Amino acid sequence: MKKYIILHLSLILLVFIACTDDQKQDDKNITFQRSDFKVRKSLSGKTIEFDSLILRPSQIQLFDSFLVTCNQGAEKQFHIFNLNTAHKEGECTPVGQGPKEMMTPCFVNRNDSVVIFDMMTSTIFTYSSPEFTSGKEPEYASRISLDTKPLWSNIRSLGNGFLGVSYQETSPGFLFDQTGKKTMDFGTYPKTEQEYTPAELINAFRADLTTNRKEKVAITHYFTDLICIYNVNGTLEKQLRGPDHFASVFKEFRDGDIIGRKASPQTYRDAFYSPVYVGNSLFGLYNGKMVT
């Protein structure tokens, strides 16, 4: 197992800052091509060799000069490394459902504190950065439970509340207030010429989301190259379609008593992953290849 990590981002392919004049667009619908990205940037980084093993983290996050890796399934899931000294400060948060334990943790997009969402228990934990990166078992500053359980989604901060993907037919997202109460169904599913059952629709538009924490929300889709931009009230502002203009088609099937959904092999393609807002820019990983 390696002790080093390369701080190098080579897979960020798309940056959405503004729409160029040659893009086809109306008030809400914008199409773009690969050729619309006029500038190609090469990102470079350096290798930091730590004094302890780096496992195989499912997530990493920076808090000031500390790198925190999330290692789901490890005895203690968060490992804290000091970037300045290359020293491992410690580990924290055992697997479990106790007051200081988590089952399936995910980082929430905050930089003023450490906020972590446990999907399995639909619980949001907030810590001060110094407390969480001390190398000891941290004491949380707040712990709230969402009233929708379980919520198998990344959670993002939006205003004074939290937003997650719903995986329900009513809307693509759920908005929660700072107490964990669901306050609204957020957004609407895109219109499609394909006739879908509710379950097929949810699978066709499986999504991830990100926010700028204030007033903008971007919902990106795993199996269609479509990005939907909403305001804080859940009103659709723009749809960005491209660069390849495709949509994977899903169909229900029955196997005995089991009803499932699967994509048509002729249309099954990967689209967007891991969206992140940085200031007024939206970064996203894009694939575009057929799923085999």
Label each residue range with its predicted role.
Residues 29-55:
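A short helix->beta-strand "capping" segment at the edge of beta-propeller domains
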Residues 120-122, 128-159:
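Asp-box/WD-like beta-propeller blade repeats and closely related beta-sheet repeat scaffolds
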Residues 15-18:
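C-terminal motif of bacterial Sec signal peptides marking the signal peptidase cleavage site
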Residues 87-121, 142-146:
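Blade-loop segments of beta-propeller domains
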Residues 46-77, 273-274, 281-290:
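Beta-strand-rich domains and repeat architectures in extracellular enzymes and scaffolds
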Residues 56-61, 105-110, 152-158, 200-214, ...:
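Structural signature of eukaryotic scaffold interfaces centered on beta-propeller domains
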Residues 83-85, 129-132, 177-181, 231-235:
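Short loop/turn segments that connect beta-strands within beta-propeller blades
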Residues 237-275:
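Flexible internal linker/loop segments at domain or repeat junctions
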